[in-house]
């Protein structure tokens, strides 16, 4: 499974959205309806899935699906 597929699955599981809604340009808050707790849970799920630690400053910059993909790929 690719990074994109893993991140899409995490987003679908955490936010209860469909695969069609998880587009690279989708904003977690504006397009996918996430609140601050959802964002924290998404970051924690990504940390667990990819075995990395995302510091708070970086986490605040992950606003869209493509931001998460780029961040994870950069950390691997």
Swiss-Prot record:
PANTHER family: ACYL CARRIER PROTEIN (PTHR20863), CARRIER DOMAIN-CONTAINING PROTEIN (PTHR20863:SF76). GO terms for cellular component: cytosol; membrane. The lineage of its organism: Bacteria, Pseudomonadati, Thermodesulfobacteriota, Desulfovibrionia, Desulfovibrionales. Its main location: cytoplasm. GO terms for molecular function: acyl binding; acyl carrier activity. Residues 1-76 form the Carrier domain. It is found in: Cytoplasm. PROSITE patterns: CARRIER (PS50075), PHOSPHOPANTETHEINE (PS00012). Pathway: Lipid metabolism; fatty acid biosynthesis. It comes from Nitratidesulfovibrio vulgaris (strain DSM 19637 / Miyazaki F). The modification O-(pantetheine 4'-phosphoryl)serine is found at residue 36. It comes from the Bacteria. The keyword Repressor does not apply. Keywords: Cytoplasm, Fatty acid biosynthesis, Fatty acid metabolism, Lipid biosynthesis, Lipid metabolism, Phosphopantetheine, Phosphoprotein. This is Acyl carrier protein. Pfam families: PP-binding. The gene is acpP. Carrier of the growing fatty acid chain in fatty acid biosynthesis. InterPro entries: ACP, ACP-like_sf, PP-bd_ACP, Ppantetheine_attach_site. One of its GO terms (biological process) is lipid A biosynthetic process. Belongs to the acyl carrier protein (ACP) family. 4'-phosphopantetheine is transferred from CoA to a specific serine of apo-ACP by AcpS. This modification is essential for activity because fatty acids are bound in thioester linkage to the sulfhydryl of the prosthetic group.
């Amino acid at each position: 499974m690719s990074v994109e597929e893993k991140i899409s699955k995490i987003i679908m599981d955490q936010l209860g959205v469909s695969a069609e809604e998880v587009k690279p340009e989708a904003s977690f808050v504006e397009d996918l309806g996430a609140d601050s707790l959802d964002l924290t849970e998404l970051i924690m799920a990504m940390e667990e899935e990819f075995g990395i630690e995302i510091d708070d400053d970086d986490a605040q910059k992950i606003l869209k699906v493509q931001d998460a993909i780029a961040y994870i790929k950069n950390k691997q």
